[in-house]
């Protein structure tokens, strides 16, 4: 894998800077404190794509079953970053991140390990992450179960900044097939795992306002994570019970077209920062603290 040009990401909103200082103090005496790092580096190429502004609609995917399965096609190559506002309205984010020296096992372990303590979650994005407890933590930690049995059907309750907005979200992890991904195509694509989910506002967990797809696959030298986020209203979301209420709920919470486009941009930046940062330390963290997740 050829070397990438990584650059420091240095702008964070004032609430995020204040959160960083609180997180830094909280993690200080933890055995993993050295992995709490000030500098966050991201691929310059990903930054430049986001700087080009919203994507053309013909280059985006919708959350329809047909479109999400394009991610599994042999000749489909995801762009490194990008965002757009889809008709609906719906925020759209796409990304593809490389994790040098990382394996699928390491990535699975991270999703088992980090919810146990808020301080662990802050390692992932020190300026944005507050807490991410798991509803069924005992099941998540049950080593007699496979990774999929521990994660799917489980809910993480994330509190995090996206831009300067503090969001409280329920992330309901699902079997890929439950979200519409074709089982045969998934197998043929040799995907090593999925941490895909429906997302809702914490105050209204019965209304999914977002579909989030994360597919990871080992390659020579590391692992790729291909991601898509859709937040808002779209006819194809009707396959998920409660999603028909998403448009009115988001509007009630101040998410009109302009706010959703801003959210798409901020989510694109957030995704770029958090996953590239995780990639920078996960292999070392796993070697020190890791145990098999499946």
From Swiss-Prot:
Domain of life: Bacteria
GO-annotated molecular function: hydrolase activity; metal ion binding
The EC number(s) this enzyme carries: 3.7.1.24
Catalytic activity: 2,4-diacetylphloroglucinol + H2O = 2-acetylphloroglucinol + acetate
Activation and inhibition: Specifically and significantly activated by CoCl(2). Competitively inhibited by MAPG, but not by 2-hydroxy- and 4-hydroxyacetophenone.
Biophysicochemical property: pH dependence: Optimum pH is about 6.0.
One Pfam family recorded for the sequence: DAPG_hydrolase
Function: Hydrolase that specifically degrades the potent antimicrobial compound 2,4-diacetylphloroglucinol (DAPG) to equimolar amounts of mildly toxic monoacetylphloroglucinol (MAPG) and acetate.
Subunit comment: Homodimer.
Protein name stated in the entry: 2,4-diacetylphloroglucinol hydrolase
């Amino acid at each position: 894998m050829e070397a990438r040009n990584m650059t420091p990401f240095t702008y964070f909103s004032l609430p995020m800077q204040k959160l960083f200082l609180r997180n830094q103090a909280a993690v200080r005496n933890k055995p993993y404190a050295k992995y709490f790092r000030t500098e966050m580096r991201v691929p310059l190429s990903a930054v430049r794509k986001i700087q080009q502004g919203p994507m053309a609609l013909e280059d985006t995917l919708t959350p329809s079953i047909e479109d999400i399965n394009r991610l599994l096609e042999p000749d489909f190559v995801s762009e490194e970053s990008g965002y757009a506002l889809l008709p609906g309205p719906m925020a759209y984010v796409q990304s593809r991140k490389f994790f040098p020296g990382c394996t699928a096992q390491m990535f699975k372990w991270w999703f088992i390990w980090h919810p146990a303590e808020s301080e662990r979650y802050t390692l992932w994005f020190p300026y944005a992450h507050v807490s991410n407890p798991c509803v069924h933590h005992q099941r998540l930690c049950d080593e007699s179960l496979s990774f999929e049995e521990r994660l799917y059907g489980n809910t993480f309750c994330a509190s995090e900044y996206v831009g300067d907005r503090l969001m409280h979200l329920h992330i309901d992890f699902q079997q890929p097939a439950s979200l519409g991904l074709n089982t045969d195509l998934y197998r043929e694509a040799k995907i090593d795992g999925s941490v895909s989910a429906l997302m809702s506002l914490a105050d209204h967990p019965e209304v999914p306002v977002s579909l989030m797809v994360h597919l990871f696959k080992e390659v020579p030298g590391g692992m790729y994570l291909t991601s898509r986020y859709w937040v808002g209203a779209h006819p194809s979301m009707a396959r998920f019970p409660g999603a028909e209420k998403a448009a009115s709920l988001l509007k009630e919470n101040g998410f009109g077209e302009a706010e959703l486009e801003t959210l798409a941009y901020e989510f694109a930046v957030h995704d770029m920062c958090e996953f590239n940062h995780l990639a920078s330390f996960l292999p070392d963290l796993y070697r020190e603290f890791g145990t098999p997740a499946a």
